Regions:
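Extracellular adhesion/carbohydrate-binding repeat motifs centered on closely spaced tryptophans
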Residues: 217-342
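Glycine-rich, charge-decorated loop segments at or immediately adjacent to ligand/cofactor-binding or catalytic sites
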Residues: 96, 160-168
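Aromatic-lined carbohydrate-recognition surfaces of secreted/lumenal glycan-active proteins
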Residues: 148-162
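Substrate-binding cleft of extracellular glycoside hydrolase catalytic domains
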Residues: 28-142, 146-149
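Functionally critical loop-and-helix segments that line ligand-binding/catalytic clefts
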Residues: 28-38, 44, 48, 167-219
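Sec-dependent N-terminal signal peptides of Gram-positive bacterial secreted proteins and lipoproteins
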Residues: 2-26
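A mature extracytoplasmic/lumenal domain signature
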Residues: 36-38, 60, 87-89, 123, ...
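Hydrophobic anchor at the start of a short beta-strand
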Residues: 83, 151-153, 172
């Protein structure tokens, strides 16, 4: 009996060590978080430096959109870097926290956000609130984000999580500038504010991702939000033409939004249906008929075609005019006289 008790105590001790073992940087994906402080960023160089994800400061409800938000989002996405956004909080009431969440949603809607939307709660305002008041802010923000179809996460520094954010149940992004993070089970860890990355002038925050969100935020396949559709491959946004089975799709070259309707890619004009798949043959568009080559998908111009029993004259703009009846109405040509052979 004593031996069994001793064994159980040893097992419990080992388990406790494992549970609270500091998180090492080499165990996860490495990324950065950036804002206007970094100025203009060369995202191609950032990608070449091995950065695997980026959190972009959206700004705050109080001060508005970060001056470099759109440039950073477009630059990161164009270089195949998965992105998330974070909002700096000044809220002191749940109503203000809800407005901060709505602000985050409003700036995220035009981009394929591949990471949780982060609530940065660390301001001096929050140090004046009780733990319960801060948790209420977090819950309001995160619930609003979740209700809009996004995944939330809470960012703060280790001591604030241990001080005035106790009881927060949401995923956590913990700032602790040390060789390891000893806060239990962080989803992300901000390990330094003095990192150096190619493409960025000066210091930048270095982050590590530990939680796999692929079961929550799909890493592969079509993703639709706010009426826009993207195609992701391991969180990287596909751009340009994509063939899936017997269907072809076109995603615009910068942000990778799936295109519908008429599309010009520099080589020709194509037509994509409501599902984004390329359509061919004779198609009615806004009351006019156009013909798209079944082999290439490109729109034909300045030619004549026969579809079934009908003949169409196609002008330089691609508009097809049915000339079948017109041709039938033409008088028959007189028979040519037969010239006897000499």
């Amino acid at each position: 009996m004593r031996k069994s008790i001793k064994s159980l105590l040893v097992f419990a001790f080992v388990a406790s060590i494992t549970l609270f073992m500091p998180v090492k940087a080499h165990a996860a994906r490495m990324g950065i978080d950036v804002s206007y402080h970094q100025g203009a960023i060369n995202w191609s160089a950032v990608k070449a430096s091995g950065v695997q994800f980026a959190y972009i400061r959206a700004g705050s409800f109080k001060s508005g959109t970060d001056a470099y938000f759109h440039a950073n989002m477009k630059g990161a996405i164009a270089n195949g870097i998965p992105v998330g956004i974070y909002v700096y909080s000044y809220a002191t009431t749940p109503e203000q926290a809800a407005n901060e969440a709505l602000f985050a949603i409003s700036v995220a809607k035009d981009y394929p956000v591949s990471l949780p939307i982060a609530y940065d709660i660390e301001d001096s305002n929050h140090k004046m609130l009780t733990n319960a008041q801060n948790v209420a802010l977090v819950n309001t923000f995160c619930n609003t984000i979740s209700n809009a179809g996004y995944t939330p996460i809470v960012y703060s520094y280790r001591n604030f999580f241990n001080g005035r954010l106790q009881g927060v149940s949401q995923d956590k992004w913990v700032a602790q500038y040390a060789a390891a993070c000893d806060y239990p089970n962080p989803s992300f860890w901000q390990s330094s504010s003095k990192g150096r990355i190619g493409g960025i002038n000066g210091n930048v925050d270095i982050d590590y991702q530990y939680k796999d969100y692929s079961g929550i935020i799909n890493a592969n396949g079509f993703r639709t939000q706010n009426g826009k559709t993207w195609y992701v491959e391991n969180y990287v946004i596909h751009r340009g033409w994509l063939t899936l089975g017997d269907k072809k799709y076109y995603f615009e070259p910068l942000l990778g939004v799936m295109q519908k309707g008429l599309v010009a890619d520099g080589t020709g004009i194509y037509y994509m249906g409501d599902d984004g798949a390329m359509q061919t043959g004779l198609i009615d568009i806004a009351g006019n008929k156009f013909y798209f080559d079944p082999k290439t998908g490109g729109m034909l111009t300045n030619t004549t075609i026969t579809v079934g029993k009908n003949t169409y004259l196609i002008d330089v703009s691609g508009i097809c005019t049915d000339v079948t009846e017109m041709l039938k109405a033409l008088p028959a040509l007189p028979a040519l006289p037969v010239v006897p052979a000499q």
